[in-house]
């Protein structure tokens, strides 16, 4: 069984109830070419083959061109058995964004703080986190690390550290308590390699855990409070938040796309104290976020849905504004989109389509396109050349896991690039056709 909803909206009509995506460019009255059936057929075919669920929204010139959902938000139980009545993805379904948190929470907070004059990316981290000091025997010192080193993933940290698992870290790095984890990251965690300079970036969650703490130190608020107060509430976003199942929120498990079938055990092959074994639905999957940071971290923990993501991506297309609210200026946004010299696919946090090496941008995204992906199965591509944003949310990890590999990983929908390619081709925005702008 499969389905999709198609909504074609001129958002000017929705301005009455403040739900319009406001853009600096207004579309012509004639409809744009969009042969979307090929996208639907492709994803629905993969759903029939076993891909769990997906949600796709495409906006152009501030107009929603496509908003479609496919498959199931909940399909399996913890025994990897297909349940009697799988729950369909709906337009409201919220997804665990995983590393999209780095952009749509942490980077948005950082760009906003730069706009306020409260943060300079060329400053040492220590300016904002006074206890961030000390050197290792190779004289690699925390004092030398700049905010932009964290943003470009060149500070020298390991890609990940299993703080939550006593079998994977020394005793002094073990933590399932947020305050202790913060202390470890700020004062104990060693560098794996030298700082930046001419180094190729090494993508690291630790960089963004620290950047989340920078936001908290500057603002005196937790990361979730800061983005809620300064960004999400100003946009009236109701479905973008951390720890959404907390009692003060009105959400329940069935509002979410499920992820791993056996908690964090990879089909019962991994165990550590307090490990979850149930189907995850509405709880952040990421172990460092859930166990070590109580769901509030700069690298993972944010949930959102299609509509809210279309608003959040539109801010970037609008150079930092939405409606009459200015979050940051264009020059600050341009700074965060500056390619890192030794790997131009890295900006300040953002991933860039500069040398076409990131397959998830697809074949036709412009050189100016940028975005990010999330481990759970999420991807955004923002392409200012075409005034277009594409958000693809999937729950590809909500599939059986064999020898550490999730069945959902084998499908093109969960690799993103094929879907991005089809979006461009369905709008005739590719090399072999006259561009319709």
Regions found by a protein language model. Give the residues of each.
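Cleavable N-terminal signal peptides of Sec/SRP-targeted secreted and luminal proteins
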Residues: 4-18
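Boundary at the C-terminal end of the N-terminal hydrophobic targeting segment
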Residues: 22-23, 27
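Short, conserved catalytic-motif segment at the N-terminal edge
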Residues: 31-95, 118, 401-403
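Active-site SXXK
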Residues: 39-43, 56, 62, 96-122, ...
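Short, well-structured active-site flanking segments
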Residues: 65-67, 88-92, 104, 111-131, ...
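Short, surface-exposed loop or secondary-structure junction motifs
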Residues: 74, 136-368
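Short, gly/Ser/Thr-rich active-site loops of penicillin-recognizing serine hydrolases
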Residues: 318, 324, 331-335, 339-342, ...
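Short, well-ordered beta-strand elements
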Residues: 380-381, 387-396, 400-404
């Amino acid at each position: 069984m499969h389905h999709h909803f198609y909504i074609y909206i001129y958002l000017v009509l929705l301005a009455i109830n403040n739900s319009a995506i406001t853009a600096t460019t207004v579309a012509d009255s004639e409809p744009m070419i969009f042969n979307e059936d090929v996208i639907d057929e492709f994803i629905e075919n993969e759903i029939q083959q076993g891909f769990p669920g997906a949600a796709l929204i495409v906006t152009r010139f501030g107009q929603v061109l496509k908003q479609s959902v496919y498959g199931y938000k909940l399909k399996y139980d913890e025994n990897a058995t297909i349940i009697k009545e799988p729950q369909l993805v709906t337009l409201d379904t919220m997804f665990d964004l995983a590393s999209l948190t780095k952009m749509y929470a942490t980077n948005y907070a950082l760009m906003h703080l730069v706009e306020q004059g409260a943060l300079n990316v060329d400053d040492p981290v220590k300016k904002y986190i006074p206890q961030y000091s000390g050197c290792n025997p190779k004289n690699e010192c925390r004092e030398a690390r700049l905010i932009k080193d964290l943003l470009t993933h060149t500070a020298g940290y390991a890609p990940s550290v299993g703080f939550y698992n006593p079998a994977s870290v020394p005793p002094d790095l073990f933590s399932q308590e947020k305050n202790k984890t913060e202390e470890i990251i700020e004062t104990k965690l060693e560098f794996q390699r030298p700082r930046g300079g001419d180094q190729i970036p090494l993508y690291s969650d630790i960089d963004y855990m620290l950047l989340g703490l920078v936001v908290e130190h500057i603002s005196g608020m937790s990361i979730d409070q800061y983005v809620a107060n300064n960004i999400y509430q100003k946009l009236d976003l109701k479905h973008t938040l951390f720890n959404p199942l907390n009692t003060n929120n009105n959400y329940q498990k069935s509002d979410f796309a499920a992820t791993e079938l056996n908690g964090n055990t990879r089909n019962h092959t991994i165990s550590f104290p307090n490990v979850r074994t149930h189907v995850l639905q509405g709880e952040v999957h990421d172990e460092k976020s859930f166990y070590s940071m109580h769901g509030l971290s700069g690298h993972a923990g944010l949930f959102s849905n299609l509509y809210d993501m279309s608003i959040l991506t539109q801010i970037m297309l609008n150079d930092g504004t939405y409606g009459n609210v200015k979050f940051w200026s264009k020059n600050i946004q341009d700074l965060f989109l500056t390619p890192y010299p030794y790997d131009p696919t890295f900006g300040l946090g953002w991933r860039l389509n500069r040398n076409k090496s990131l397959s998830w941008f697809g074949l036709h995204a412009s050189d100016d396109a940028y975005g990010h992906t999330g481990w759970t199965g999420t991807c955004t591509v923002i392409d200012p050349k075409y005034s277009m944003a594409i958000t693809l949310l999937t729950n590809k990890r909500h599939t059986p896991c064999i020898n550490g590999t999730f069945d959902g990983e084998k499908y093109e929908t969960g690799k993103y690039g094929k879907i991005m390619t089809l979006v461009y081709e369905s709008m005739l925005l590719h090399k072999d056709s006259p561009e319709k702008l």
